[in-house]
Regions:
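N-terminal lobe/hinge region of extracytoplasmic solute-binding protein
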Residues: 40-90, 215
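Bacterial Sec-dependent N-terminal signal peptides
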Residues: 1-8
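Structural transition elements
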Residues: 361-368
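Gly/Pro-rich hinge or "lid" segments in bacterial periplasmic/extracellular proteins
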Residues: 157, 168, 174-251
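Bacterial signal peptide processing site
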Residues: 24-26
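Extracytoplasmic/periplasmic ligand-capture domains
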Residues: 74, 101-110, 115-131, 221-356
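Surface-exposed binding/hinge segments that line
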Residues: 120, 127-197
Length: 368
């Protein structure tokens, strides 16, 4: 059984849910899914304005449609994207990026609109402030003069530390050295936008169901968004790195999340390129047997679950233990180290995790 090609799609996934990574039994479906990526989505985008919005339903669509200065490879390393190279001043305050000459903006129809230039990144940051981007906190204290502009202490955007020295040269000036600055360039708040196009669209820029409400400089262009139905994308033939884009078409079909077996069944029938399966589902054992060599667990997330103990409790509004004797004994217990350790050791993390992630996924979901 062949494995389908999988497109890296930004978006949240639930902890340690099994993912099937095989293709259907039919050779015709194998051939189709080798060029097309098909999966599901659950939330319609509220906007396509990738600079102002930082919610998953937007980035789910635009991450593969709009490129920034740098990108992360499959190992998480930063690699050139719209910026083909960059330099850092000795004091760590000035970052200068060279914009590649073959980067282009195209419409949803794939028609070339304009080259991507350094000015587009300046326009993008100004649009982030004008639109009160949710991501401004990522860079507001980093870029020289930006915080003052945001607060209205100056109305002159030229005082902000982002400059287009020429069409191919972009410069950021920071308030203090940040060894992690380049990581921030992958954030939506620092993405580019063409000023002429932005002005022409006005308040219609980023309209959620209009593929023509934004321009594209990434590997894919959006073809359509049909609420509660589908999101479709196609390969951008004008993309600067198109030789490394192996997927021709992308289609996400709306899934309301009610029937957990719909995706796995669609995968088995060749409808989807991959499938998320649920270890707690009644059909998990069947799919685990059918696809045992092609089941992968997601990496555990960064979330932390804690239990806090109140050593100095003064109110007892939400407990039946309200007598002075009960309060005293409770306080003594909480101040006892061995008692607190006993509470910790009494929690079976594996069993707790298995309630959500099943027996197979329980241990995978726990980091420590």
């Amino acid at each position: 059984m062949k494995k389908s090609q999988v497109l890296a799609v930004a978006g949240a996934t639930l902890l340690a849910s099994g993912v099937l990574a095989a293709c259907s039994n039919t050779s015709s479906n194998n051939a189709k899914l080798a060029k097309d990526y098909q999966y599901v989505y659950q939330t319609d985008p509220e906007t396509l304005d990738y600079i102002v919005s930082n919610i998953d339903s937007t980035s789910f669509v635009t991450t593969n449609a709009v490129d920034g200065l740098l990108a992360n490879d499959k190992y998480g390393n930063l690699v050139p994207s719209i910026a083909e190279s960059w330099t850092v001043s000795k004091d760590g305050l000035t970052y200068t990026y060279k914009i590649r000459k073959d980067a282009k903006w195209v419409t949803a129809e794939g028609e070339e609109y304009a080259p991507v230039t350094a000015k587009d990144f300046v326009t993008g940051l100004k649009h982030a402030v004008d639109g009160k981007s949710k991501g401004l906190s990522i860079v507001s204290s980093s870029i020289k003069g930006l915080e003052a502009y945001i607060k209205g202490e100056t109305s002159d955007f030229s005082t902000v530390g982002v400059k287009a020295l020429d069409d191919q040269t972009l410069e950021y000036t920071l308030n203090q050295p940040e060894t992690f600055w380049n990581d921030k360039t992958t954030s939506g708040v620092l993405m580019p936008v063409n000023e002429e196009f932005l002005t022409s669209k006005g308040e219609g820029f980023g309209a959620p169901t209009d593929a023509n409400s934004i321009l594209y400089n990434g590997p894919f262009v959006l073809k359509s968004v049909t609420p509660k139905s589908s999101i479709e994308m196609a390969k951008n033939d004008a993309y600067w790195d198109k030789e490394n884009v192996k997927i021709e078409n992308v289609k996400f079909t709306f899934w309301d999340g009610k029937d957990q077996d719909v995706i796995a069944k669609g995968f088995s029938d060749g409808q989807y390129s991959k499938a998320r399966i649920f270890p707690t589902s009644s059909t998990y054992e069947k799919y685990a047997a059918d696809f045992k060599d092609n089941i992968y667990f997601n990496e555990p997330g960064a979330g932390v679950a804690t239990v806090s103990l109140n050593y100095g409790r003064t109110t007892y509004n939400h407990t039946a233990k309200t007598s002075d004797a009960q309060k005293t004994s409770t306080q003594k217990a909480l101040l006892n180290k061995e008692f607190r350790q006993a509470l910790n050791f009494a929690v079976d993390r594996n069993s707790y995790s298995a309630q959500t992630n099943g027996t197979d996924g329980a241990a995978v979901a726990i980091r420590n």
